[in-house]
């Protein structure tokens, strides 16, 4: 009985082996005939890229002059319309001139007396009728009288309060009949020059130092005369039609904010910009000749937090690659390293990607970088 069971077991072993081999062959056939997953890819194109930075700022007047009297007296008349444009040298107020007219008349009379005495002494000196000292005293008195008469004329002119600069004048702080004094603390009015107008913006010093390093290393090139041009957007999103020019930057860093103040000058013929307005200034930073841009959705992060992308190699196999993200540019990342021109990165079906698998790459849908539309891109610090 035992012998019969042993013979049967020997007969079943080859059959089981054959069955296992057939089953494995079927599994290999199924695996070999599996369809590769379809993924959307974006083909990277190196391109010239002009980088700009968006900085908040405020407008400030080109010139501001507070009008104060240089003569004392009763204000007789205001001679301008509040809020109107005034020209330099235009009369704004009239101070009662009668006191100064009398002082001028007395000074001119004293001048005439001193002049006649000096001329008379000059003739007497020729005949030795007076001493040289008497003649010198008479000449000094004449010159002093000339100076006093000139001062009286100046004070007389000061009764007419003139506009110190051309610009728009604000409200009058005094009315007719008010007593004003020479050099008083309160201004009579303020004249503001609005054309051109300044825009002051603050740039973080870390960003400024990074740009300098990029320019020194050659990663960024200056864009010629356009680097000094500044574009402006109003607080409501309306673009300002005229370009400005970057004038200077402060030589010191604000300790509280760690930023440097930059000043730009804008033409303002229609007075659309008023002092104190909040605006956004777009400054040219530089140009990168062969910039590598990839869509935001192509970049992920691994468990260590390192930026990575899935790259489809020429044989359609997938590879995970670490990249260096420099900054965002519109709807894309500007890369410093990791991806080369012409390589394909996965933007759709990223969840299907695994290292080493074969995929079916197709052109990704609805993936367009802002720079490909020809619009000027905007850079933000990363």
UniProtKB/Swiss-Prot annotation:
Subcellular location: Cell inner membrane
InterPro entries found in the cross-reference section: CusB-like_dom_1, CusB_D23, MFP_Efflux, RND_pump_MFP
Gene Ontology BP term (one): response to antibiotic
This protein's record includes keyword Coiled coil: yes
Signal peptide: 1-23
Gene3D superfamilies in the cross-refs: 2.40.30.170, 2.40.420.20, 2.40.50.100, Helix hairpin bin
Membrane topology: Lipid-anchor
Swiss-Prot/TrEMBL keywords: Cell inner membrane, Cell membrane, Coiled coil, Lipoprotein, Membrane, Palmitate, Signal, Transport
Induction annotation: The ttgDEF operon is induced in the presence of toluene and styrene, but not m-xylene.
The protein's role, per its UniProt record: The periplasmic linker protein component of an inducible organic solvent efflux pump. Involved in export of toluene and styrene but not of m-xylene, propylbenzene or ethylbenzene. Is not involved in antibiotic or AMP efflux.
Stated name of the protein: Toluene efflux pump periplasmic linker protein TtgD
Species of provenance: Pseudomonas putida (strain DOT-T1E)
Gene it is expressed from: ttgD
């Amino acid at each position: 009985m035992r012998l019969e069971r042993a013979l049967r077991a020997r007969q079943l072993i080859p059959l089981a082996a054959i069955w296992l081999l057939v089953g494995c062959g079927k599994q290999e056939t199924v695996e070999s005939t599996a369809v590769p997953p379809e993924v959307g890819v974006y083909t990277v194109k190196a391109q010239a890229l002009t980088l700009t930075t968006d900085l908040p700022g405020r407008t400030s007047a080109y010139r501001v002059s507070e009008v104060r009297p240089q003569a004392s007296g009763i204000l007789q008349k205001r001679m301008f319309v509040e809020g109107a444009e005034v020209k330099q040298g235009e009369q704004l107020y009239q101070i009662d001139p009668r006191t100064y007219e009398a002082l001028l008349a007395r000074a001119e009379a004293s001048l005439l007396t001193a002049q006649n005495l000096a001329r008379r002494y000059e003739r007497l000196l020729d005949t030795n009728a007076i001493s040289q000292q008497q003649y010198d005293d008479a000449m000094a008195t004449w010159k002093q009288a000339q100076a006093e008469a000139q001062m009286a004329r100046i004070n007389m002119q000061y009764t007419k309060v003139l506009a110190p600069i051309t610009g728009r004048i604000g409200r009058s702080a005094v009315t007719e009949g008010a007593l004003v004094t020479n050099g008083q603390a309160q201004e009579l009015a303020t004249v503001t020059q609005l054309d051109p107008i300044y825009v002051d913006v603050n740039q973080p010093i870390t960003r400024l130092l990074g740009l300098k390093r990029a320019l020194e290393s050659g990663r960024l090139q200056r864009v010629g005369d356009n680097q000094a041009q500044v574009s402006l957007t109003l607080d409501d999103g309306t673009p300002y039609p005229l370009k400005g020019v970057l004038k200077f930057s402060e030589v010191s860093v604000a300790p509280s904010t760690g930023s440097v103040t930059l000043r730009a000058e804008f033409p303002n013929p229609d007075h659309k910009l008023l002092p104190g307005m909040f605006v956004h200034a777009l400054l040219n930073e530089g140009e990168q000749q062969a910039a590598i841009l990839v869509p935001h959705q192509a970049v992920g992060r691994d468990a260590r937090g390192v930026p990575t992308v899935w790259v489809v190699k020429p044989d359609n196999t997938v590879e995970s690659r670490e990249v260096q993200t420099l900054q965002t540019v519109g709807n894309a990342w500007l890369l410093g390293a990791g991806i080369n021109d012409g390589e394909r990165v996965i933007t759709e079906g990223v969840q299907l990607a695994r290292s080493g698998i074969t995929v079916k790459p197709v052109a990704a849908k609805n993936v367009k970088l802002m720079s490909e539309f020809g619009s000027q891109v905007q850079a933000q610090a990363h």
